[in-house]
């Protein structure tokens, strides 16, 4: 199963303070907008997302079809294939995608310790 780029999505209280903190650690802004209350930041191959007011807890995020630079990769598993494989393994999908759809979509699963995992395909 190819899940694509991995990042941790952090729920932050003050996006400007968080941006400054992670810039001090060597991260640079890759995508997003302060006006929209989210930034994707990168340090070498590490990605973090800063999200203010969008969700309550931190989320592990995978982006099928993207590499860590947000570039499309040729060979990837479509999110609907990933969803079906996880369902067949008995993993509960919190917001199932219509398997007859195509293109961008997302769903969430929760690991045994309550950590939310977002599978978020943008293409």
Stretches found by the model and what they are:
Residues 1-19, 122-123:
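N-terminal beta-strand motif that seeds the catalytic metal site of vicinal oxygen chelate
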Residues 3, 36, 102-104:
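Loop/turn position at the start of each blade in beta-propeller repeats
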Residues 9, 28-35, 98:
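Conserved catalytic-core motifs of GNAT/GCN5-like acyltransferases
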Residues 13-16, 54-55, 64-116:
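Vicinal oxygen chelate
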Residues 20-24, 113:
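Structural preference for long, well-ordered alpha-helical segments within the folded cores
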Residues 23-30, 91:
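Conserved acetyl-CoA-binding loop of GNAT-fold acetyltransferases
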Residues 30-70, 116-121:
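Conserved short beta-strand elements that form part of the metal-binding/catalytic scaffold
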């Amino acid at each position: 199963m190819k899940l694509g780029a991995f990042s941790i999505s952090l729920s932050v209280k003050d996006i400007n303070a968080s941006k400054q903190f992670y810039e001090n650690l060597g991260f640079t802004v890759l995508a997003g907008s302060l006006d929209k209350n989210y930034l994707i930041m990168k340090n070498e191959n590490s990605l973090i997302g800063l999200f203010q007011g969008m969700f309550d807890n931190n989320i592990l995020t995978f982006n099928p079809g993207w590499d860590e630079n947000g570039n499309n990769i040729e060979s990837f598993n479509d999110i609907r294939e990933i969803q079906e494989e996880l369902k067949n393994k008995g993993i509960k999908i919190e917001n199932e995608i219509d398997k007859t759809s195509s293109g961008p979509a997302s769903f969430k699963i929760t690991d045994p310790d309550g950590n939310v995992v977002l599978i978020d395909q943008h293409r």
